[in-house]
């Protein structure tokens, strides 16, 4: 039986990796920002300077990603955890409103000890467990959600064990129906204006996560300096289009979410 959606505003968390994208997220009406760096790598820990600059202007909550390097194993050494916890302390001292973290063992089970260290270091700020969850054993998903809640995580970001939330929406609906009373399961990955209504309808989520990207972003102004045509690049991203959060895309998503909230 599908649970009826209660009368509430469905919240949009926008994932950003730049100051300009953060401003676009707020302009579009997002409820919260997940701040990271290197979104093209799946999102890494942001810089203190970026957080401080955004906090000086924006009033919306900012959750900071805690991820010391690229890679989808999410198996961290003691040294990597030491660096991560140091970053966490500095981010908290400079205004972070929450954190996003995930850690696994080599067998892809959740690394409970490392999770406890992060939750203890959070100082009571909310912590989201990210899509590392989607690499765990799907057969144990309910037990793992219960464990995350008992550890102290406030929410889970998941694509339902599939590449995108649209692909995994049926699994997400199951998780949400079972755990939403005391834990937030937040769909994310590949959510677009074109598939948002279906994802909200099927999943019955209270929150969702998107980057609302557009090539160069809505208000991007190209540098006035002339870029010489040459073969020198600073990395793969230099040869790809520059993507940023588009406030118009955010606004469209918020409008859809509000319409769905009133149903």
Curated annotation (Swiss-Prot):
Keyword line: Copper
> Which GO molecular function annotation, any one, does this entry have?
copper ion binding
Q: What is the top-level taxon of the source organism?
A: Eukaryota
The entry assigns this protein to a family as follows: Belongs to the CutC family.
Q: What does this protein do?
A: Involved in copper homeostasis.
| HAMAP family attached to this UniProt entry | CutC (MF_00795)
Protein's UniProt name: Copper homeostasis protein cutC homolog
Lineage summary: Eukaryota, Metazoa, Ecdysozoa, Arthropoda, Hexapoda
